[in-house]
Every structure is written in C-alpha cells, then in structure tokens.
Curated annotation (Swiss-Prot):
The organism of origin for this protein: Halorubrum lacusprofundi (strain ATCC 49239 / DSM 5036 / JCM 8891 / ACAM 34)
Organism phylogeny: Archaea, Methanobacteriati, Methanobacteriota, Stenosarchaea group, Halobacteria
Biased composition, class Low complexity, residue ranges: 455-466
InterPro entries named among the record's database cross-references: AAA+_ATPase, ATPase_AAA_core, P-loop_NTPase, Rep_factor-C_lsu, RFC_lid
Protein name listed in UniProt: Replication factor C large subunit
GO molecular function: ATP binding; ATP hydrolysis activity; DNA clamp loader activity
Region (Disordered): 443-500
Subunit structure: Heteromultimer composed of small subunits (RfcS) and large subunits (RfcL).
Length: 500
C-alpha cells in the first residue's frame, strides 16, 4: 500500500496547508530570484511541510529538482559533486545557468534542495558546512536549505541566505487535509476522530497523515473509538511485539504496541527485517519491505542528524506499515531469531546498555538514547583517565565494555589497566559500604564495653547510650540509600551523576 504522505504530497504551493504567509513569501522569493540570486532557508519543526513546499514550488515554476538529504553523506566533496554541479553548470535540459527572468531560461532552472542543513557536522560530513556556505554565495541556480532549528546553522550560512519560518500546523488546518484524504480513499469518518488525530500530533501534519493511514488500514470507516489516544501502561515483551506486528494486530494496534516495547526503533526494525520472511507470504514480503525501506531512510536521518524526533516516522513504517502489508491475521508459533547481521559490537552494546539501565534505574531506551552517548562523549579514548575508571566501576564494565564506550581497542594496555583500577575501586567501595553497615554495631559494642565499669541507673543510661550509637549508624546507612533512590527517580537523567 502506498505511503499516504507521498501519495497526497502537495503538487502546487496552493495545496500547502497551514502556512499561508510562509508559502507566499516562498513564492515571492522564487519569482524574484533573478534579481537577488540568494538561497533561502525554510525552517520549522519536522512534519510541517517544508520539503513538500520546496517540491511544490518547483512544480509551479517548471523547475527540475536535485535533492541531497540527511541520510546521504554530505562532505565538501559530495556537496560539490552533486549540488555544486547542478547549481553552477548547465541544467539537465541543456540551458546555461544564470539566464534572465523572462524567456525559457527561467523554466529550465534546477532547484537545489539540501535537507537538514542545520545538522551538518562531524567527520561524517567533514567540510560540508563551509562547502554549502561557499555554494550559496556562488550559485547560478536557486537553492533551498531545509532546517529544523535555524539557529543551529552556522552564522556565515545564515548571513548568506534569506529565511522563511514554517510554523507548526494548527489542528484546524490539519483536519481538512485528513478529511480530503478520507473522501478520496472512500473512507467514512467521524469528525471527532479526525480532530483527535490532529490534536494528538501537535502541529505535525505528516505524523497526522501517518496516524490516519494506520487507523484506517483494512477499514472503510473511522470512529472516535478507533483512535488510540495514549500509550499502553504495561511494557510489552519483544516476542509478543513481533507477534503483534507480524501476525495479529491491525496497523494502528501494532503502532501502539511499538510504543510499549522498551527497545529503540532501530533495534525493532532489525528484528522485523530478520523475521518477516518466516511469517509472510511472498506478496506480503514485497509490500513489507517497501515500508522497511522507508524506515531505514528515517533511521539514516536519525544517525546523521541525532534528531530523535524522526524515530516516530521509522516506527510508523516498521510497525504500522509492516502490519498493514499483511493479509489478515496469522496463527501458529514461530521461533523468532536474533538478526543474523547482529555483530559482536551490537551484542556488546546490548550488554553495556543493559548494565547502565540496571545500575541507573532507567529504561533500556533511555540508557541507549541519553546516558550512553553522554558516557561516550566524556570518556572518549579513556580521557580523562580518572573519570573513565569511575565510570567503569559505577557500571561494572569489563574490558570489552570499556573499549566499547570509550572507542578504544579492547586489547590495549590502557583499557586493561583501567579495568584493573575499576575493579579495585569497586572492591574499595564494597569495603566502605560494609564498614558503614556494621559501624553501628561496633559503636554499640564499644559503648556497652565502656559501661561495664559503671553503675547502670534505673533508667538504663548505659543502654540508652548504646541505642544512640546504633541509631547513628543506621541513619548513615539509610541516608546513603535514600540518595541512591533519589538519583533513580528521574529516568531521563538517571546514572549521569553517579560518578561525575
């Protein structure tokens, strides 16, 4: 089944909903481009229609498009080879760049679209930001940069471009889009159901369309009760989740099951990819892999940009999409296998993340998404050494775990010595903990011993002294435990202060 966000993508700017001022400013930029030759930045939250507007504008102007998105590597060399060639040289139609506003040259231009311009960084995109800045200054073709956060872009790039903000799409603008899709698909609807979908997506038009498609899969109507408004309270196991997606549940139900599993979307996608062949018929597999390919694109964007809001689109495809590819429910028992391409480093990552989650009192997903990247950053290549030792001791990491977190070689003397020192630190802390636990008993015994030569009065003064010592020891131990419990209360920050 076709992805509705693509099937109903606006073909002209007049069809772009919810951002009339931005749409008009964008059209003005295009019509006057020959006068200013400036690139433009379309910025705003994911799913508000920035990329769709760029393609719609190209249709309106009769321009061809060249697109480089966040799942592509965007080094200086790549940008020059793809976008630079299109921007500086002849168009595919054979016309020279830089023609006048009148005549056929304008219609034969190419619109260069660079997605996620605010997330070009690191070795993966080495030199990309400076190459784009140079490109927009010298371009002979119109360039559109797409960004979520305008101020995450380099200042030089901001200064060299115009900017147009696309705001979150209001629920009252989303509902008509959903209504039009229902009518074109022959789906009867309750207005309250569409309003609930629109409100739940909080300005994300793309997400609302995905939710509508999931909720109506295999149906010819949608009512309020068909729209699930919240996540399930009870965590779902991995194998029940696979049953839900591959055998039992509707697209909407499978999507909610995905939200209830304590795993990240990239791991869930790997499990689905590895097991779908064992459950689906050939025709179903073909449809399922179309959705899995879309999920991989979104996961690529997450890896390239570290923008985890894109995870929801990967989940939409890997869960709801794959479930929608199935013809009815399936019975029987299936031996689900771990992904065959799960490398030793993946296994190490699972073990490390599991230990972090257990020690910190947070979920596996939080440990993988928030705590692990922090640890990797502050202990890169085992520096500073003292902090790395403390981290390894806090999370009970062996040499393989230390090497994985720090990005160092497992067989190096550096990692081995850190593992030894971490073990020594753990033992030292265990001794200190044991001494604290028995300190009260020792104090009580000392006090009782000291009172042997004294006359105990009727009120039991000596015994009271012993009781005071016992109470003091207990208070110290309980205070430590209470602090540990407080660290675990905040799932998002659990574990980060354990050793810093």
């Amino acid at each position: 089944m076709a992805d509705w966000t693509e099937k109903y993508r606006p073909s002209t700017l007049s069809e772009v909903r919810g951002n009339d001022k931005a749409r008009d400013a964008f059209a003005d930029w295009a019509r006057s481009w020959d006068d200013h030759h400036e690139a433009v930045v379309l910025h705003g939250s994911p799913g508000v229609g920035k990329t769709s507007a760029a393609h719609a504008l190209a249709n309106d102007m009769g321009w061809e498009t060249v697109e480089l998105n966040a799942s592509d590597q965007r080094t200086a060399d790549v940008i020059e080879r793809f976008a630079g060639r299109a921007a500086r040289n002849a168009t595919l139609g054979g016309s020279a760049a830089g023609g006048g506003a009148a005549g056929g040259d304008t219609a034969s231009r190419q619109l260069v679209i660079l997605d996620e311009a605010d997330n070009i960084h690191g070795n993966y995109d080495r030199g990309g930001a400076s190459a784009i800045t140079e490109l927009v200054k010298e371009s002979g073709q119109p360039i559109v940069l797409i960004a979520n956060d305008y101020y995450d872009m380099a200042r030089g790039l901001r200064n060299a471009t115009q900017e147009i903000e696309f705001r979150d799409v209001s629920a009252r603008s989303i509902v008509p889009v959903l209504r039009d899709i229902c009518r074109k698909e022959g789906i009867e609807f309750e207005s309250d159901a569409l309003e609930r979908i629109a409100e739940r997506n909080r300005g994300d038009l793309r997400g609302a369309i995905n939710d509508l498609q999931a909720a109506t899969e295999g149906r010819d109507s949608i009512a309020v009760e068909d729209v699930v408004t919240g996540d399930r309270d009870k965590a779902l196991g991995l194998f029940p989740y696979l049953d839900a997606v591959l055998k039992e549940e509707s697209a909407e139900e499978a999507l909610q099951s995905a939200y209830a599993v304590d795993e990240t979307p990239d791991d869930l996608t790997k499990w689905i990819e590895n097991n779908v062949l064992d459950v689906y018929d050939p025709s179903e597999v073909v449809r399922a892999y179309d959705f899995l390919a879309n999920a991989d694109v979104w996961l690529g964007r997450v890896r390239a940009t570290q923008n985890y809001s894109y995870w929801r689109y990967a989940t939409d495809n890997a869960a709801a999409g794959v479930a929608a590819a199935r013809d009815g429910t399936k019975g029987g028992w299936t031996r689900y296998g771990r992904p065959q391409f799960w490398s030793p480093s993946d296994a190490t990552a699972d073990e490390v993340v599991g230990q972090i989650a257990a020690k910190s009192g947070c979920s596996v997903a939080t440990a993988r998404r928030e705590v692990l990247p922090f640890l990797e950053a502050v202990t890169h290549h085992c520096k500073p050494r003292e902090l790395t030792v403390a981290m390894a001791a806090a999370y009970d990491l062996d040499e393989a775990g230390i090497a994985f977190v720090t990005g160092s070689g497992e067989s190096t003397n550096k990692v081995a010595s850190i593992a030894e020192d971490a073990q020594a630190l753990r033992e030292e802390r265990m001794e200190d903990h044991a001494e604290g636990a028995f300190a009260g008993g020792r104090h009580a015994a000392d006090d009782l011993g000291a009172s042997d030569g004294e006359t105990t009065n009727a009120s039991g003064t000596a015994s009271s002294s012993g009781d005071d010592g016992d109470a003091d020891g207990t208070t110290d131990g309980d205070g430590s435990d209470a602090n540990d419990g407080n660290d675990d209360d905040d799932d998002g920050q659990a574990g980060l202060s354990d050793f810093v």
